[in-house]
Amino acid sequence: MARPKNVKHIFVTGGVISSLGKGILSASLGMLLKSRGLRVAIQKYDPYINVDPGTMSPYQHGEVYVTDDGAETDLDLGHYERFLDEPTSQASNLTMGRVYKSVIDKERRGEYLGGTVQVVPHVIDEIKEKMNDLAKNGSLDVLITEIGGTIGDIESLPFLEAMRQLKLELGDRNVLNIHLTFVPYIKAASELKTKPTQHSVKMLLETGIQPDILVCRSEKPLSREIKNKVGHFCNVHEQDVIGLNDCETIYAVPLMLLREQLDLRVMKKLGLKKFREPNLEHWKRFCEKVTNPKDGEITIGVCGKYTEYPDAYKSIIEAFIHAGASNDVKVSVKMLRAEDAEDSSFNMNKAFEGVSGLLVAPGFGDRGIEGKVQFVQYARENNIPFFGICLGMQCASIEFARNVCDLPDANSTEFNKRARFPVIDLMEQQKKVKEKGGTMRLGSYPCILKEGSKVHEVYGKFLINERHRHRYEFNNQFRKLFEEKGMIFSGTSPNGELVEIIELKEHRWFVAVQFHPELKSRVQKVHPLFDGFVQAAKEFAMGKRQLTLEDELPRLSSEEMEGAG
């Protein structure tokens, strides 16, 4: 198989409306090209002026996805990693804020030799230089770049201009544009409407870019007639109009695009030849397990502060899909708003109806903390499988200190700087940090597991590496007391100073971690902790069903019992 001499660039843009799924499209195409033997990477360009999403509200941006090298990035990078099973990095996410910051820093250093710094050429040249960063080391065949925003947005124009110039410089055989649009279905007319797509392409043409391939999102499949009409009015061949209708799971998208031959159209246009046929049997089996689990459904409660906006917990939800497939069940997530438990009229028994496990999610700030602590207490006292992540571990520590160690005023100094029993405290190296952005303990760090612990059993090894995003840690002054009361510190930093994992031996599953395991769960590599947690929740659910069944069976009299013998 002959490698291309130059890295091939694929740019994915979106039109008509936002949230069409450019990230899923990019990840799916990347997976298809990788399955053919090509070396693929994906990057995301966001048009906002923030340097990174690290300080942005989860309500506005969703979760912050942390890479191994400590970059705080867009949640779409999570899709890239889950679909490609390849790590991303700081270079995989560029914001317009970082571009402007770099240009201004260069101006301050005098690198522009007294010239007037302008969007064209200086900002555009900076973007083009960044576009090639991932391609410089010679380890790639294809680089896919997702351009955030919607065609027509002012913010995206510099990215589009850089893309236009790059295509002019490198040629059609090296740069390709895929434009994702929306074809709405009008129920009153019982037909799909192509006019929004036509207008979106018209706006893209106004920037000097002719799309090479159109991918049309729709509620229903596109007929050949519709594809022909779209192609005719948008100046692309009918075979370059790809249908992408709604499906049960996002993991079915690569299979749909394979049937539509998107990967073949891309390879032909970029002159990529003699690559192997894709083998996606493993992916098909996974999708079958997701859509038709043989052991039914279980419900897991996710207690958080941002439950109105599920994208704030995107990687957690996806990790449950992976773990559900691994355990032959569908995991239905029930969002539990932490603040609700702080109301005196709140019924905890009702909140846990039908729930077979509790995950207390990450977050920042004191809002809803007391509610989270109450949820942890209920799960611990009722032997319900429990899993805490980051802030969830800190809440589990506070709850254990108050209700088991008899430290009623236990708290974190994040919520009460004068806490009498600060079982969670600011990390020593964080105490002189003043700025918010990019200053936490970020990225991948090693952790040593305790032999014989639950986590050692599920990981099957002693040394692990997990991704972190936190400023506060367990206060070691309380370790001895916790251990005396039954808490196991089953994971620590290699020097033993930083507590990474806690668990309870006598509980069916009570594990809490300081890191973010959801960020490393993959389709073919379900994260061991999610796998173990879902398995415990499944066993708990089956036990409850068995008890319910026994209660519903008619009770036989002693005479009937003797007769049955």
UniProtKB/Swiss-Prot annotation:
Enzyme class: ligase
GO terms under biological process: 'de novo' CTP biosynthetic process; pyrimidine nucleobase biosynthetic process
Binding locations of L-glutamine: Y59, G363, L391, G392, M393, Q394, E414, R471
Residues that, per the record, bind UTP: S18, K193, T194, K195, P196, T197, Q198, K229
Binding positions for CTP per the UniProt entry: S18, D153, I154, E155, K193, T194, K195, P196, T197, Q198, K229
Gene Ontology cellular component annotations, sorted alphabetically: cytosol
E.C. numbers: 6.3.4.2
Disulphide connectivity of cysteines: none
Keywords for the protein's UniProt record, in alphabetical order: ATP-binding, Glutamine amidotransferase, Ligase, Magnesium, Metal-binding, Nucleotide-binding, Pyrimidine biosynthesis
Renumbered residue ranges of the record's region Amidoligase domain: 1-272
Catalytic activity: UTP + L-glutamine + ATP + H2O = CTP + L-glutamate + ADP + phosphate + 2 H(+); L-glutamine + H2O = L-glutamate + NH4(+); UTP + NH4(+) + ATP = CTP + ADP + phosphate + 2 H(+)
Protein residues bound to Mg(2+): D76, E146
Claim: Cytoplasm is one of the keywords in the record: no
Documented activity regulation: Allosterically activated by GTP, when glutamine is the substrate; GTP has no effect on the reaction when ammonia is the substrate. The allosteric effector GTP functions by stabilizing the protein conformation that binds the tetrahedral intermediate(s) formed during glutamine hydrolysis. Inhibited by the product CTP, via allosteric rather than competitive inhibition.
Pathway: Pyrimidine metabolism; CTP biosynthesis via de novo pathway; CTP from UDP: step 2/2
GO molecular function: ATP binding; CTP synthase activity; glutaminase activity; identical protein binding; metal ion binding
Family, per entry: Belongs to the CTP synthase family.
Other known facts: CTPSs have evolved a hybrid strategy for distinguishing between UTP and CTP. The overlapping regions of the product feedback inhibitory and substrate sites recognize a common feature in both compounds, the triphosphate moiety. To differentiate isosteric substrate and product pyrimidine rings, an additional pocket far from the expected kinase/ligase catalytic site, specifically recognizes the cytosine and ribose portions of the product inhibitor.
Chain's role: Catalyzes the ATP-dependent amination of UTP to CTP with either L-glutamine or ammonia as the source of nitrogen. Regulates intracellular CTP levels through interactions with the four ribonucleotide triphosphates.
Subunit record text: Homotetramer.
Name this protein carries in UniProt: CTP synthase
Organism whose genome encodes this protein: Chlorobaculum parvum (strain DSM 263 / NCIMB 8327) (Chlorobium vibrioforme subsp. thiosulfatophilum)
Gene (UniProt): pyrG
